[in-house]
Amino acid sequence: MALIELDNITFSYAPEETPVLRDFSLSVETGECLALRGDNGAGKTTLLRVLNGLSFPQRGIYRFDGETVDRAYLKNQRRAKIFHRRVGYLFQNPDVMLFNATLREEIAFGPRQLGLPREEIEIRVRDCLALFDLEPLAEKAPYHLSGGQKKQAALAAVLALNPEVLVLDEPLAGLDARTRAKLTALLTELRAGGRTLILATHDDSLCAALEARILILSAPEPEES
């Protein structure tokens, strides 16, 4: 059984609009890396949001590890905590994920929401700061950070949850060459360690480094009335 299964899902943002995803099916195995490609409007970000439980299809079924994920499933606080501990999501725009707390507090926020012990939270925060060489910025608020530092801080916050699955929306977008190389190496290491990666990216070198299975999405045609 695949870890992630989408069975003929259809999603639209409004009833009168053409669906962004129509009768779409997908399966992803544990430890696999899947790269989503396609033009703007093809549904890459929408698909990532469905996989992370931020959007829900109007038709079809999403199964994660054999359990159906829908609004009712995630309304249960215990199940929602388990799901979001297992599936981490990096937005394309890191500002969506960062508040005005210090970077240390930003990274600690997710583990704290999961109810982890204080000592465990401190260890995870320390390790994630070190992973991205962000220790000198630990007491700074995000508005003091560059765009590349914000992206790394947002990914650090995701990794602090220690998720099995990483859902990443354009993880290298807007980064300089040095930071792109650094994050490519990190994601390659995570992939080698058995993490499941699903990402939207236009970066050919990243796909090659991750040995990703590539899925090209295209926007559905409007239905005839």
What are these regions (language model features)?
Residues R37-D39:
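The feature captures the beta-strand-to-loop junction immediately N-terminal to the Walker
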Residues N52:
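Helix-to-loop junction immediately C-terminal to a conserved catalytic motif
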Residues G60-A72, F83:
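Conserved ABC transporter NBD signature motif
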Residues E119-L137:
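Conserved ABC ATPase "signature" region
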Residues A141-L145, Q149:
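Conserved ABC ATPase signature
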Residues T201-H202:
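H-loop/switch region of ABC-family ATPase nucleotide-binding domains
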